Amino acid sequence: EISEKEQRKRFKKLEASADTAWRVTEADWERNRCYKKYARITKEMIDATNVPWAPWTVIDAAHKEKAALAIMEAVSSAMEAALEKKAAGRETPRFEPPLPPDKYKKGILSRVDLEKTMDREEYRKKLDQLQKRLERLHGDLYRYRIPVVLGFEGWDAAGKGGAIRRLTSHLDPRGYQVCPTASPSSTEKAHHYLWRFWTRFPKDGHMAVFDRTWYGRVMVERIEGFCTEEEWHRAYQEINDMEAHLVHSGAVVLKFWLHIDK
C-alpha cells in the first residue's frame, strides 16, 4: 500500500527550506489527509485506463535518480519502436473499442518492484548513455515527423518535476514543451474538460510533456466534487478514446505513474 507517512515526510522536507516551501500548499496537505481515498481511486483509475495503445508505466519513485533512468529507458524504447514502424512503412494498428473499466486486467500497482537499488557509479554511466540516446532519437523523431505525448502523474512529492528535468535536459528546447497543469481558467471551464489538453498536444515531430494530465478528471476533480458522478464515470471512456485517436494518428503516447511506498 502507498505510504501516507512517506508523503508527509517529503512535504515536511520541502517546507523546511525557504526555497521549496512554496511548493507545498494546504491542498497538498488536504490530499494527504484523504490519502486512503486517493489510493483507492488511483488504483481504479489506472486499472480502467491501462489500455494496449496507451499503457501505464508505473515507476518506483522512492529513489528519484533511478526513477529518472527508468523513465528515460521507457521513452527511448517507445521512440525506437515508432521510428522502426515508420521506416518500415507499417500502419498504426487499429485497436478494438475500449472495454468497460471492470473488464481490464487488475493490479498493475501491486506488481511494481519497489526494492531495486543502484549504486552511484552505475547511475552516472546509465544517465550519460540514456541522455545521448534520447538526444539522437529526438532528432530522428523530428525528421520522421512523429509526435510524442508524455503524461506524468503520481503522488504529491513523488518527484515528477525532477524526473521531467532529467528527461529533457539534453533535448533541443525548440522540439519539446513542458505543460504544467494547474486549475482550469475561466476560458477553459467554458469548454469540454479535454479541450485545454487538445490545444497543447504537439505538432508532428515535436514532444509535449504534461506535468499532471487529463486524469485529474477522475482523481482530484472527482474527489473534490468539481464534477458529477455521471461526468467522471463517462470520463474513463472519453480519455481512452482520446488516447486512441492520438495513437491512430501516429503519435507516441506514454503515461507514467510515480509510485512511492515505504
Residue ranges of predicted features:
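Glycine-rich phosphate-binding loop of ATP-dependent small-molecule kinases
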Residues: 1-262
